[in-house]
């Protein structure tokens, strides 16, 4: 009997374990499928947005055709020989168009009138590849003749060798040869076809070069900012190269990332970039930065390339590309009546840094003749000591004594972790939003892998509702109200504070972290995520 009971108990234990394992496996698979569906939905949403943008572009192109019809109508007015070439329907259309007086919209030809001299000025002189479209990420690599050493082959190997098979189907690498010497261009193409024949035939790699007629006369440029005539010509041509490459790449994918021809990359870079972008799909960012150096690793949403190219064309002779990009952000969000700190906070919402850097510059000899550049990205080998999120625009302040420049402002903007000397009772960290925000949840993480013991202890999380009166809140929430109008909604446990915000408290004017008791350790804050409500 004991044996039978023991056998039954063993069988029951086995069945229970099996059912538990089956349930967990089903739940885990369901969770993974849900995450995959969410990513597919975000990608679909982004493609719909791009489709809307392209419809708008087509409308603009049709308007241009209408303007051309008007010019034809004006030029053929009174010329019977010319008019006899058109059908009755065309003559009727020309008459209708010519009779309408509408304003002319300026185009890029105003800034680059030389393009009108040749119909093929905006068509690649050389174009190798399958013309792949519909990918997530387009990588643009401009390359020009270097006097000492070319790094292009090594760069492409680094990019391609660090892609998984499925990732190779979801991107395209466009190599732009910024030279008009057709023999040189064909030589580069031959080398690339020999080294990357499989990648070119599959559609992963494309190679283009511009026609000579694309470039204006660059011999009489104004010298500015103390740059020599040669350097001014170099940076001006570089701006034009970027524009041609962006225009070609825009129709190919959801995102466009600007690279250079003398870099190496980290493992898993593609998945990291794509997931980071998808996490920010609900935010109004303009630039994601995956490197600290120059124009390397700067990623844009494809529809935004139109504005960027137009802006660069307007000022391509005036300043380098990185300065022009900063000017675009300034024009979009900075208020001349506010101070520089306010402007930096606003720009930080459009220009988001990812840490650590995914791309490292390795070229010693610049494409500018005679220039040696020992530039390396210091963040490339650094461990990830902070986690970046996009938070609502806010003015931040603290009573804590900051250690070695690890400021709260840098943490909130995703540039560095916050590090402060031993907190005492009464110390605070304050995030005062520029305008009231509906907040869904919050997460504050203290300490990091280098200093895991520097955490916030005996610290509470408090919010200040925008409305001080008339709040329809529960008794439980009401009991959390403090004398100064803040509500205590959470606290740090084991260095972490996270939770949901009672919707009845929204919109929120400020978040505050308040130290209740003296601490025996310093404090690091390496993650701040104040998540806005979606509705």
Curated annotation (Swiss-Prot):
The protein's PTM annotation reads: N-glycosylated.
One GO cellular component term noted in the UniProt record for this chain: peroxisome
UniProt-listed InterPro entries: Glyco_transf_54 (IPR006759), MGAT4_A/B/C_C (IPR056576)
Reactions mediated catalytically: N(4)-{beta-D-GlcNAc-(1->2)-alpha-D-Man-(1->3)-[beta-D-GlcNAc-(1->2)-alpha-D-Man-(1->6)]-beta-D-Man-(1->4)-beta-D-GlcNAc-(1->4)-beta-D-GlcNAc}-L-asparaginyl-[protein] + UDP-N-acetyl-alpha-D-glucosamine = N(4)-{beta-D-GlcNAc-(1->2)-[beta-D-GlcNAc-(1->4)]-alpha-D-Man-(1->3)-[beta-D-GlcNAc-(1->2)-alpha-D-Man-(1->6)]-beta-D-Man-(1->4)-beta-D-GlcNAc-(1->4)-beta-D-GlcNAc}-L-asparaginyl-[protein] + UDP + H(+); an N(4)-{beta-D-GlcNAc-(1->2)-alpha-D-Man-(1->3)-[alpha-D-Man-(1->6)]-beta-D-Man-(1->4)-beta-D-GlcNAc-(1->4)-beta-D-GlcNAc}-L-asparaginyl-[protein] + UDP-N-acetyl-alpha-D-glucosamine = an N(4)-{beta-D-GlcNAc-(1->2)-[beta-D-GlcNAc-(1->4)]-alpha-D-Man-(1->3)-[alpha-D-Man-(1->6)]-beta-D-Man-(1->4)-beta-D-GlcNAc-(1->4)-beta-D-GlcNAc}-L-asparaginyl-[protein] + UDP + H(+); an N(4)-{beta-D-GlcNAc-(1->2)-alpha-D-Man-(1->3)-[beta-D-GlcNAc-(1->2)-[beta-D-GlcNAc-(1->6)]-alpha-D-Man-(1->6)]-beta-D-Man-(1->4)-beta-D-GlcNAc-(1->4)-beta-D-GlcNAc}-L-asparaginyl-[protein] + UDP-N-acetyl-alpha-D-glucosamine = an N(4)-{beta-D-GlcNAc-(1->2)-[beta-D-GlcNAc-(1->4)]-alpha-D-Man-(1->3)-[beta-D-GlcNAc-(1->2)-[beta-D-GlcNAc-(1->6)]-alpha-D-Man-(1->6)]-beta-D-Man-(1->4)-beta-D-GlcNAc-(1->4)-beta-D-GlcNAc}-L-asparaginyl-[protein] + UDP + H(+); an N(4)-{beta-D-GlcNAc-(1->2)-alpha-D-Man-(1->3)-[beta-D-GlcNAc-(1->2)-alpha-D-Man-(1->6)]-beta-D-Man-(1->4)-beta-D-GlcNAc-(1->4)-[alpha-L-Fuc-(1->6)]-beta-D-GlcNAc}-L-asparaginyl-[protein] + UDP-N-acetyl-alpha-D-glucosamine = N(4)-{beta-D-GlcNAc-(1->2)-[beta-D-GlcNAc-(1->4)]-alpha-D-Man-(1->3)-[beta-D-GlcNAc-(1->2)-alpha-D-Man-(1->6)]-beta-D-Man-(1->4)-beta-D-GlcNAc-(1->4)-[alpha-L-Fuc-(1->6)]-beta-D-GlcNAc}-asparaginyl-[protein] + UDP + H(+)
Provide the E.C. number(s) assigned to this enzyme. 2.4.1.145
Phosphoserine: residues carrying this PTM? 474
Q: Where in the cell is it found?
A: Golgi apparatus membrane
What does the UniProt function comment say about this protein?
Glycosyltransferase that catalyze the transfer of GlcNAc from UDP-GlcNAc to the GlcNAcbeta1-2Manalpha1-3 arm of the core structure of N-linked glycans through a beta1-4 linkage and participates in the production of tri- and tetra-antennary N-linked sugar chains. Involved in glucose transport by mediating SLC2A2/GLUT2 glycosylation, thereby controlling cell-surface expression of SLC2A2 in pancreatic beta cells.
What's the protein called, per UniProt? Answer: Alpha-1,3-mannosyl-glycoprotein 4-beta-N-acetylglucosaminyltransferase A
Q: Which organism is it from?
A: Pongo abelii (Sumatran orangutan)
Species lineage: Eukaryota, Metazoa, Chordata, Craniata, Vertebrata
């Amino acid at each position: 009997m004991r044996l039978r009971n023991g056998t039954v108990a063993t069988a029951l234990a086995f069945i229970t374990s099996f059912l538990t394992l089956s349930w967990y496996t089903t739940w885990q698979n369901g969770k993974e499928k849900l995450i995959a569906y969410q990513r597919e939905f975000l990608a679909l949403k982004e493609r719909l947005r791009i489709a809307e943008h392209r419809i708008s572009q087509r409308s603009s192109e049709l308007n241009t055709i209408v303007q051309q019809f008007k010019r034809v109508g004006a030029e053929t007015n009174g010329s019977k020989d010319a008019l006899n070439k058109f059908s009755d329907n065309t003559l009727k259309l020309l008459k209708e168009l010519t009779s309408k007086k509408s304003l002319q919209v300026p185009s890029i030809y105003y800034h680059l009138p030389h393009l009108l001299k040749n119909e093929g000025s905006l068509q690649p002189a050389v174009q190798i590849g399958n013309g792949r479209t519909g990918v997530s990420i387009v990588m643009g690599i401009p390359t020009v003749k270097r006097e000492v050493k070319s790094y292009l082959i090594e760069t492409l190997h680094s990019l391609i060798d660090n892609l998984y098979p499925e990732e190779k189907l979801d991107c395209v690498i466009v190599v732009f040869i910024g030279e008009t010497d057709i023999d040189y261009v064909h030589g580069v193409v031959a080398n690339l076809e020999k080294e990357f024949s499989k990648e070119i035939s599959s559609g992963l790699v494309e190679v283009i070069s511009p026609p000579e007629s694309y470039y204006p006369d660059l011999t009489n440029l104004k010298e500015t900012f103390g740059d020599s005539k040669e350097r001014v010509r170099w940076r001006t041509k570089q701006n034009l190269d970027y524009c041609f490459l962006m225009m070609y790449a825009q129709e190919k994918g959801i995102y466009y990332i600007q690279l250079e021809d003398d870099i190496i990359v980290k493992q898993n870079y593609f998945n990291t970039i794509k997931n980071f972008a998808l996490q920010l799909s609900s935010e109004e960012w303009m630039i994601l930065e995956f490197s600290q150096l120059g124009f390397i690793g700067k990623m844009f949403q494809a529809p935004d390339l139109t504005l960027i190219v137009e802006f660069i064309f307007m000022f391509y002779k005036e300043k380098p590309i990185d300065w022009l990009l900063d000017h675009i952000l300034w024009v979009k969000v900075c208020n001349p009546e506010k101070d520089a700190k306010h402007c930096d906070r606003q720009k930080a919402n459009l220009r988001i840094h990812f840490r650590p850097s995914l791309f490292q510059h390795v070229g010693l000899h610049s494409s500018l003749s005679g220039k040696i550049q020992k530039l390396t990205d210091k963040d490339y080998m650094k461990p990830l000591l902070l986690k970046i999120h996009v938070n609502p625009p806010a003015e931040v302040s603290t009573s804590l004594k900051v250690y070695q420049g690890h400021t709260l402002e840098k943490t909130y903007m995703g540039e560095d972790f916050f590090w402060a000397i031993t907190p005492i009772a009464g110390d605070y960290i304050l995030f005062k939003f520029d305008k009231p925000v509906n907040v869904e949840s919050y997460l504050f993480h203290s300490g990091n892998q280098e200093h895991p013991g520097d955490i916030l202890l005996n610290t509470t999380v408090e919010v200040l509702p925008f409305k001080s009166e008339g709040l329809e809140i529960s008794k439980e929430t009401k009991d959390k109200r403090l004398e100064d109008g803040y509500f205590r909604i959470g606290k740090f446990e084991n260095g972490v504070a996270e939770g949901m915000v009672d919707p009845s408290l929204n919109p929120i004017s400020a978040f505050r972290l308040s130290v209740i008791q003296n601490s025996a350790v310093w404090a690091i804050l390496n993650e701040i995520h104040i998540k806005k409500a979606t509705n």
